[in-house]
């Protein structure tokens, strides 16, 4: 018997796991009991449980020992004990990939699959499909077709789910079962209907027309399964994002109609789908927000959490749409669930007024230590949106500095540091307070990335403060106490103080001379370089070599250096071979209006022209609808040999860079013109469409197609 532990033991973790100290060799030794006659179901169950526990804990089983245990386990099919038989099915599925000759149990599983015991049939189908390969699938095809349309829902669902897995092995064979899947889709059982819809979609997902027909059929005839409705909403949403009809499509009407469904799950899925559609207007969002507002007062914590989390996302882009929910969100501030209360406060910070900031900050500071790092990051992001209130910067800075002192992971600390840095850079009045908090933080900072980032900021902003000398101690402490990367960053920061403050220069030169004795090459090289530059006492040299740094493309330089090391050459590395980095374009930031941020309106004719131009290029035909085109950005000076402007066209998973090029040399004719791009690691250049020719003073257009990474926030 397994001892029953009380709640206190469970929470402390002491003795709550009876399998905690299992040894694989001892368990495999115990498995020999499978060969005994008569079979003892209770003892065999306990041993199978131990084997499954070890497998799920990641314990490695060798092929020979796994095969031995598997063959011994097959003898347990002689027992008629239901629990033992179902445990055998589980073990077969887990050991299918590590044992040899697992097909030996095919006949036993087929017998159970076609037998009269319904309790065996479903699990037997799942286990059989787990050990079946492409060559054996046709042998059980007849049984699978019968199982899909079986009257017993557990059998039908098992066959449908197994069909989904079998598609990866033999899509063509499973495609022949489409008629049976369609019959199952009309089942009265909610899970059978849901699984059947999943099979039908995966069989047709590469055929847009077939998927559209399937959607039309089910949206007209209706469904009994709330799970199937949720899947239909997701399919419709995916098609809508790729469609050119936009929100005038019948698909949008279907999703909106689901807001009036009797199932809460379907209502939330529809609201979430509408909110995540690109280019959604406030009018189109209104019904979804109204539904979420009702969920905010639900007695169910899961519904309240889902509603407030979704409203939190809406508030980032459409704060005015959420202001109607402010009263409901105020009521959630005191919710017993800390996650719900946190999201309610952060949403109100995005949508509320300046007068409410103090109260909300005080409210959240009372329990911020109790919430997880994930929600602390959400809090910091919400606070960063309140930067439009300069009079509240001191309150925000105090709150952030207190959070910075608390324990937390890298992402949490990074969010706080980024928020303080943005306040320092945008508000001169908060500069000294922000720098003081950051100096205190790097005295005990375990994250190299954050320490170097703060040192860079100190080097940039510190020399321009009224008393720059007070930061020198904090920076030089890093040279004495930290690792190589931080020491190197500290040396660069010191050099910037010496370059901009004549009174501090003698002290900085002494400190740099000490750094020349460092054990690390990088630190010594930087110190030597900066010392020699500063000793010249020339502002032009300081500007070129200390303030501005490298103007080349960093990814381009990395690739060029890697190529240089692969092909040994006597010639020195040529920096001129590296493409220059694009100068940062500082756009005037529009203040974050917590009521209604007016989106930048592009003339419809311009957007339509771009859509038409891009659709005419074969390489861009399948990119889907064009979401937005940026304003032209000038990449070169007007008087250079070649004048280049860039327009970025945003699609669902891609960006098209349009380069408008003009040749200003009257004695040259360029042909097949492209613009070389060096993307970061996670981005991928798929193709370039060159401009056929570029005669004198006649503009030409070339394009570059780049795939966005999955985790990219713009994707």
UniProtKB/Swiss-Prot annotation:
Keyword Protein transport among UniProt keywords: yes
Gene Ontology CC: COPI vesicle coat; COPI-coated vesicle; cytosol; endoplasmic reticulum; endoplasmic reticulum-Golgi intermediate compartment; Golgi membrane; growth cone
Primary site of residence: cytoplasm
Region (Disordered): 1-20
One MF term in the entry's GO annotations: structural molecule activity
Function: The coatomer is a cytosolic protein complex that binds to dilysine motifs and reversibly associates with Golgi non-clathrin-coated vesicles, which further mediate biosynthetic protein transport from the ER, via the Golgi up to the trans Golgi network. Coatomer complex is required for budding from Golgi membranes, and is essential for the retrograde Golgi-to-ER transport of dilysine-tagged proteins.
Protein name: Coatomer subunit gamma-2
């Amino acid at each position: 018997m397994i001892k029953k532990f009380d709640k206190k033991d469970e929470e402390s973790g002491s003795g709550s796991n009876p399998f905690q100290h299992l040894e694989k060799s001892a368990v495999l030794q115990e498995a020999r009991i499978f060969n005994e006659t008569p079979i003892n179901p209770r003892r065999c169950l306990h041993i199978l449980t131990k084997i499954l526990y070890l497998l799920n804990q990641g314990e490695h089983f060798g092929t020979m020992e796994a095969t031995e245990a598997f063959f011994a386990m097959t003898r347990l099919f002689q027992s008629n004990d239901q629990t033992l038989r179902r445990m055998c099915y589980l073990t077969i599925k887990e050991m299918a990939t590590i044992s040899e000759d697992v097909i030996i149990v095919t006949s036993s599983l087929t017998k159970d699959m076609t037998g009269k015991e319904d309790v065996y049939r479903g699990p037997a189908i799942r286990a059989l499909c787990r050990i079946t390969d492409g060559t054996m699938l046709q042998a059980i095809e007849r049984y699978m077709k019968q199982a899909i349309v079986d009257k017993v829902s557990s059998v039908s669902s098992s066959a449908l789910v197994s069909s989904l897995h079998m598609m990866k092995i033999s899509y063509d064979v499973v495609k022949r079962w489409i008629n049976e899947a369609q019959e199952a889709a009309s089942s009265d059982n909610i899970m059978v209907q849901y699984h059947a819809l999943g099979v039908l979609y995966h069989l047709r997902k590469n055929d847009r027309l077939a998927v559209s027909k399937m959607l039309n059929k089910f949206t007209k005839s209706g469904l009994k399964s709330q799970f199937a409705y949720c899947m239909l909403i997701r399919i419709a949403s995916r098609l809508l994002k790729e469609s050119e009809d936009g929100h005038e499509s019948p698909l949008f009407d279907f999703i909106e109609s689901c807001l009036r469904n009797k199932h809460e799950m379907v209502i939330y899925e529809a609201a979430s789908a509408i909110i995540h559609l690109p280019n959604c207007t406030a009018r189109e969002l209104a019904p979804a927000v109204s539904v979420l507002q009702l969920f905010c007062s639900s007695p169910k914590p899961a519904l309240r959490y889902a509603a407030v989390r979704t409203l939190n996302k809406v508030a980032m882009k459409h704060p005015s749409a959420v202001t109607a929910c402010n009263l409901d969100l105020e009521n959630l501030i005191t919710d017993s669930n800390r996650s719900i209360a946190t999201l309610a406060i952060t949403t109100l910070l995005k949508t509320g007024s300046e007068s409410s900031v103090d109260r909300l900050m005080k409210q959240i500071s009372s329990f911020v230590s109790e919430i997880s790092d994930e929600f602390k990051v959400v809090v910091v992001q919400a606070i960063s949106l309140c930067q439009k209130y300069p009079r509240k910067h001191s309150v925000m800075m105090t709150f952030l500095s207190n959070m910075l002192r608390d324990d937390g992971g890298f992402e949490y600390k990074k969010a706080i540091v980024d928020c303080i840095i943005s306040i320092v850079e945008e508000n001169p009045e908060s500069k000294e307070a922000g720098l003081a908090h950051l100096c205190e933080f790097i005295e005990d900072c375990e994250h190299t990335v954050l320490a170097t980032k703060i040192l860079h900021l100190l080097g940039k902003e510190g020399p321009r403060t009224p008393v720059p000398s007070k930061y020198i101690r904090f920076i030089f402490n890093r040279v004495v106490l930290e690792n190589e990367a931080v020491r190197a960053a500290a040396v660069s920061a010191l050099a910037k103080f010496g370059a901009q403050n004549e009174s501090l220069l003698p002290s900085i030169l002494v400190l740099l001379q000490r750094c020349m004795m460092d054990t690390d090459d990088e630190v010594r090289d930087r110190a030597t370089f900066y010392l020699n530059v500063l000793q010249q006492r020339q502002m032009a040299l300081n500007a070129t070599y200390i303030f501005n740094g490298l103007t080349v493309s960093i990814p381009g330089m990395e690739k060029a250096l890697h190529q240089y090391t692969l092909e040994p050459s006597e010639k020195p590395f040529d920096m001129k071979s590296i493409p220059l980095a694009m100068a940062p374009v500082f756009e005037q930031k529009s203040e974050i209006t917590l009521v209604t941020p007016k989106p930048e309106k592009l003339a419809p004719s311009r957007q339509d022209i771009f859509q038409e131009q891009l659709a005419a290029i074969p390489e861009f035909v399948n990119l889907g609808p064009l979401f937005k085109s940026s304003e032209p950005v000038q990449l070169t000076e007007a008087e250079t040999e070649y004048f280049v402007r860039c327009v970025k066209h945003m699609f669902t998973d891609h960006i098209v860079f349009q380069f408008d090029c003009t040749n200003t040399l009257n004695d040259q004719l360029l042909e097949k013109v492209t613009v070389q791009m060096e993307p970061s690691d996670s981005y991928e250049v798929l193709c370039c469409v060159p401009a056929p020719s570029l005669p004198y003073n006649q503009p030409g257009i070339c394009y570059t197609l780049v795939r966005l990474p999955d985790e990219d926030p713009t994707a």
